[in-house]
Amino acid sequence: MAGVDEVGRGALFGPVVAAAVLVPIEAINQLQALGVKDSKQLSPQHRSQLAQALPDYVHSYGISFADVPTINRVNIRQASLLAMERAVQKLPVMPAWVLVDGRDTLPHIAMAQMAVTGGDRKSLLISAASILAKVWRDTLITRLAERFPGYDLASNKGYGTAKHRQGLRQYGATPLHRPLFCRKIIENPD
C-alpha cells in the first residue's frame, strides 16, 4: 500500500513537490512508533530526523515536482495532481492501493485509489509522504534563497509571509515566483 501527498500548493515561490511511499502493511505500526505524523505538526528538526530515518522503514519512495511554468500552464490543482502522479510512477514497484491526500484521486494512475481529505492527519502512509516532500522542498527553497535575497525565503520557504510580500513589492517577482499568485500582492500593496 502507498500514500502520496504534496507540499507547496499555497506557496508564492517555487515548485509544488510530492512524495509517494510504499509501505508493507506489517511495517505501518513501526511508522507510528517512529513518531510519524502530519509534517505540519512537526518541528523542522524533527521532520528532518524522520526524513532521514524513513527510508529504513518503507519499502520504497518516490519524489517529484511540478515547476512554476507547469503551475502557470495547468493551474495549481492540476500541477499538484501531476506531481503526485509522477511521485507514484517513480516507485519501483506499483502498489495495490494508493491513499491520496485531498479530495481528488490521480486521474492518470490506473490502480485502486482512495482520496482522503485531511489524509496527512489520518493516514501514517500519507504522513510519511508529507514529511519526505516537505523536507525535500524546504531544502530546495533554502538553497534557492541564496540566489534570491530580499524575500526571506530561507525562513518562509516560499509562503506569503509579511517579509516575503514586502520583498515582492520592493523587488518584484523572480522567475521562480508564481505570477498568478503574486500579481495581486505587487499591484495592490495594501
Curated annotation (Swiss-Prot):
<feature type="binding site">
    <location>
        <position position="5"/>
    </location>
    <ligand>
        <name>a divalent metal cation</name>
    </ligand>
</feature>
<keyword id="KW-0378">Hydrolase</keyword>
<keyword id="KW-0540">Nuclease</keyword>
<protein>
    <recommendedName>
        <fullName>Ribonuclease HII</fullName>
        <ecNumber>3.1.26.4</ecNumber>
    </recommendedName>
</protein>
<dbReference type="GO" id="GO:0030145">
    <property type="term" value="F:manganese ion binding"/>
</dbReference>
<comment type="function">
    <text>Endonuclease that specifically degrades the RNA of RNA-DNA hybrids.</text>
</comment>
<keyword id="KW-0963">Cytoplasm</keyword>
<dbReference type="InterPro" id="IPR001352">
    <property type="entry name" value="RNase_HII/HIII"/>
</dbReference>
<dbReference type="GO" id="GO:0032299">
    <property type="term" value="C:ribonuclease H2 complex"/>
</dbReference>
<dbReference type="GO" id="GO:0005737">
    <property type="term" value="C:cytoplasm"/>
</dbReference>
<dbReference type="GO" id="GO:0003723">
    <property type="term" value="F:RNA binding"/>
</dbReference>
<dbReference type="InterPro" id="IPR012337">
    <property type="entry name" value="RNaseH-like_sf"/>
</dbReference>
<dbReference type="InterPro" id="IPR036397">
    <property type="entry name" value="RNaseH_sf"/>
</dbReference>
<feature type="binding site">
    <location>
        <position position="6"/>
    </location>
    <ligand>
        <name>a divalent metal cation</name>
    </ligand>
</feature>
<keyword id="KW-0464">Manganese</keyword>
<dbReference type="Pfam" id="PF01351">
    <property type="entry name" value="RNase_HII"/>
</dbReference>
<keyword id="KW-0479">Metal-binding</keyword>
<comment type="similarity">
    <text>Belongs to the RNase HII family.</text>
</comment>
<dbReference type="GO" id="GO:0006298">
    <property type="term" value="P:mismatch repair"/>
</dbReference>
<keyword id="KW-0255">Endonuclease</keyword>
<dbReference type="InterPro" id="IPR022898">
    <property type="entry name" value="RNase_HII"/>
</dbReference>
<feature type="domain" description="RNase H type-2">
    <location>
        <begin position="1"/>
        <end position="190"/>
    </location>
</feature>
<feature type="binding site">
    <location>
        <position position="101"/>
    </location>
    <ligand>
        <name>a divalent metal cation</name>
    </ligand>
</feature>
<dbReference type="GO" id="GO:0043137">
    <property type="term" value="P:DNA replication, removal of RNA primer"/>
</dbReference>
<dbReference type="InterPro" id="IPR024567">
    <property type="entry name" value="RNase_HII/HIII_dom"/>
</dbReference>
<dbReference type="GO" id="GO:0004523">
    <property type="term" value="F:RNA-DNA hybrid ribonuclease activity"/>
</dbReference>
